[in-house]
Amino acid sequence: MNIKITADSTCDLSEELLRQWNISLMPMHILMGDDTYLDGVTIHPADVFAHVDAGGQTPKSAAANPVEYIDFFEPFAKEYDAVIHISVSAKLSSCYQNACLAAQEYDNVSVIDSENICTGQGYLVLRAAKWAADGLTARNICMRLQNLANRVELSFVLNQLNYMAKSGRCSGVLAFGANLLGIKPSLAIIDGELKVVRKYRGSLPICVGKYITDLLDGRDDIDNSMVFISSCQPKPGCMEAIKAGLRKYGKFENIIETDIGTTIGGYSGPGTIGIVFAKKV
């Protein structure tokens, strides 16, 4: 069975992985100032950071509309026996709803709610591509993805709250206080939504080390076959702290490093770093 895997650009997989596994992305719309850009195509995190650092507001993201999804799916629906599109969490965006509406135009397009974002979504996308390469049927892959979605854990540590404040996701006073006290919040996807789960204090590398210990120490329920390290212009020492923690606690067989894209990076800001893995069945 000839199966095509597609996803929303929020999955933040590298160009190398996309080429290797023949994965195609539907770009999110990024609204910055008076202009609209396509995530990963006409705008990248560095562009957002330069805009915000120059005094501009953080960008807003918007889903592609159903007609755009129809146009996106059409060539793949004609070329492949089946198309499986893995969407950003339905609780975070209307991408899933719009993709489902578009999929109704085709008999061979399925849409899966990843219940995640960034490489939490990317974890499912890469698994789907590997299963397709192994010869699984589209029905089997979709069933596996639905079972996997609520076992994927995404979390990260923010270096600052300035970008969250500018986007309206926290108050400027809270951001100022957190930055003044050196507080680094840790966010995670819980039930398809981003929530603050812990707060650390100190330099970012020290906070990252504590974050990894809290996340992995003493656990025996983790699937150690694959882990993502996702970062956005990581600060010195942070990548080393993450990898040291993974070696100590995780014993992961495959460590994949990826860059956080425009959609999440525009809210979290530079310095953000985290990991993604799945729990055992």
Where do the language-model regions lie?
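Short beta->alpha junction loops
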Residues: 63, 113-115
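Short, contiguous strand/loop micro-motifs
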Residues: 1, 59-60, 86, 161, ...
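Mixed-charge interfacial surface used for oligomerization/domain docking
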Residues: 4, 10-24, 29, 35, ...
